[in-house]
A protein has these predicted regions:
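N-terminal cofactor/phosphate-binding cores enriched in small/glycine residues
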Residues: 41-159, 471-472
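Phosphate/diphosphate-binding loops
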Residues: 311-351, 355-356, 372-383, 388, ...
């Protein structure tokens, strides 16, 4: 069952224009996802299908920090671009010409300071507010710099990285007077959490643990004391609805990743298991209190966590606007929920090759689970790298479509039963990637109608796509590929209408802004290996180049 959606809802929906404040209608790109709604949409339309062939580099900036490429989304506020490299070097640039205004070098973590994955430095974003620039570090600190000078103003430890094995790779989310951040280490033997700090001082405001403690509601979904080491870290950036005053986050997988003998209290896989892992949660922004949850993958045995972006949209239903969210997990299942209550409204599956389940019922239950077994070789599709990686999809209110890069890669692994060691990797398996069978192209950038669950168009690509998508009011969709091509597609048809070779593979996120009435499209360029190195090795003829460059494109005056 590839497309599952309640027909009565789908037939009752119509698109009525922007309807809702997208937060990126002005010249700036102030948040990781463009706005707090996480659309990755720019309302600027100076660059469009009629003139894009004239689009050319306006300026290029080399960070000089090439380790792990450039994975971030640049932020632009009041004509200044703020950028962080994978190793947490922060730059402020004149967004009109790329000139460096200041630079801050965050010291690398000492060897052995963390218990595992957090020793890999891969900062993916920052945010700006209250005259400060906020970012997280691989040694699990949240840092605030002076926005004008780059001087450190405050620095707080979210937790002891040596104990939890965790760090911070995602961009923080600024909500009112607080900065909210999760942490990586979803595969570590620790208890994941979201933390809010007061933006001006760094003082702790609240902390919400993904896994309920002893005596708390939901703890009964864990076996014994496995909740203490159950992972679930929300390792990407969330969203915020100011009208409801709720933050929305996707949570990580349960640990250990591929074996549940120590953590699943029941063999009944139709029930919620290991709450609140592999879920979308809504929390009260002021207190961190859980308002509602929806678990997408109960008893996750495939490392199919739900940590990706949560896209908030208002759509007309039976003559009235309904407040929705769309969320894609690593599995490629895309859920549409009522964001006020968490009510399930529909789900559709995006990968073309899928064998981890046989389908989904009309009420969102997984059926035909193909579960890895200890000591046995398991093959399943998509792989734990995800049908979509952490790089974000986009939503255009002009077309009403979601745009997502999808990869067709499978995995082979053999789970083991091992005891947890606090703060250390708790995956309990080695893993090999495999090309999905019967394929010529191993990825595709798709446009999906989130209401009907139907694919509107698909742009095929021979290898893998691991960069975010940008949609604009010029009815354009931008992304980059590992060979270094930065491309633009027609948002309504999927036709490729422009490209530029940047010289290095794309792993980060393009964005758009305006300075002095001139629209820019900026993209990071620079490949990161890490886990995706295993994906690249599937394609011996794929030549991937590293780098750490921002290329900002604009139209010449005659074409504007």
């Amino acid at each position: 069952m590839k497309h599952i959606f309640r027909a009565t809802l789908a037939c009752a929906l119509s698109y009525s224009g922007y309807g809702q404040t997208d937060g990126a209608t002005r010249a700036d790109w102030p948040h990781y996802g463009g706005s707090q709604l996480s659309w990755r949409f720019s309302a600027l339309d100076q660059i469009n299908a009629s003139n894009i062939k004239a689009l050319a580099p306006a300026w290029i900036f080399q960070t000089g920090d090439y380790a792990e490429g450039l994975q971030a989304t640049p932020i632009v506020v009041d004509g200044v671009m703020y950028l962080i490299t994978a190793r947490a070097q922060v730059f402020a640039l004149d967004a009109s010409n790329g000139k460096v205004l200041w630079q801050h070098r965050y010291p690398p973590p000492r060897p052995g300071v963390a218990g595992g994955l957090s020793e890999v430095q891969e900062s993916r974003g920052l945010t700006v507010g209250f005259g400060l620039v906020f970012f997280g570090s691989s040694d699990n600190h949240l840092v605030a710099l002076d926005q004008k000078t780059g001087r450190e103003v405050w620095n707080v430890a979210a937790d002891d990285p040596k104990q939890c094995g965790c760090g911070i790779s995602a961009a923080p989310l600024l909500v009112k007077d607080k900065v909210i951040i999760g942490g990586n280490g979803g595969d570590q033997a620790h208890r994941g959490y979201l933390t809010a700090f007061y933006a001006k001082t760094g003082r702790l405001a609240w902390r919400w643990y993904v896994i309920p403690g002893a005596g708390e509601k939901g703890n009964e979904t864990w076996k014994g004391d496995s909740w203490k080491f159950g992972g679930g870290a929300p390792w990407m950036t969330g969203s915020y609805d100011p009208a409801l005053n709720l933050v929305y986050w996707g949570t990580g997988n349960a640990a250990s990743d591929f074996y549940d003998g120590a953590r699943a209290p029941s063999a009944d896989k139709s029930k919620e298991t290991n709450l609140y892992t592999a879920s979308v949660v809504a929390l009260e922004a002021d207190t961190g209190k859980l308002r509602w949850h929806y678990q997408e993958v109960p008893d996750d045995l495939w490392d199919f966590d739900s940590s990706y972006e949560v896209i908030l949209m208002d759509r007309e239903v039976r003559g009235r606007m309904r407040q929705l969210l769309a969320h894609m997990s690593k599995s490629g299942l895309t859920f549409v929920l009522d964001r006020t209550t968490g009510e399930f409204l529909g789900v559709f599956s995006v990968p073309e090759v899928r064998n981890w389940i046989s389908g989904v019922t009309e009420d969102g239950k997984l059926v035909g689970r193909n579960e890895p077994k200890p000591g046995q070789l398991a093959d399943f599709c998509p792989s734990p790298a995800g049908a979509k990686s952490w790089n974000s999809m986009a939503y255009s209110p002009r077309t009403g479509l979601l745009y997502a890069p999808i990869n067709e890669v499978c995995a082979a692994l053999r789970p083991t039963d091992e005891a947890p060691q606090e703060g250390h990797s708790f995956m309990n398996s080695s893993m090999d990637f495999k090309p999905a069978p019967g394929r010529v192209n191993y990825s595709h950038l798709d446009a999906w109608d989130p209401i009907s669950g139907k694919r509107v168009w698909s742009y095929p690509y021979k290898y893998i796509l691991l960069a975010s998508v940008l949609a604009t009011a010029g009815d354009l969709v931008f992304t980059g590929d590992p060979e270094g091509d930065f491309i633009a597609l027609n948002a309504r048809t999927g036709d490729k209408i422009w490209s530029y070779q940047t010289g290095a593979g794309h792993r980060g996120s393009a964005m758009s802004y305006s300075v002095g009435g001139r629209q820019f499209i900026a993209t990071p360029s620079g490949w990161q290996m890490g886990l995706v190195g295993g994906l690249v090795r599937l394609f011996p003829d794929l030549q991937v180049r590293g780098g750490s460059t921002v290329v900002a494109f604009a139209l010449p005056e005659a074409a504007r």
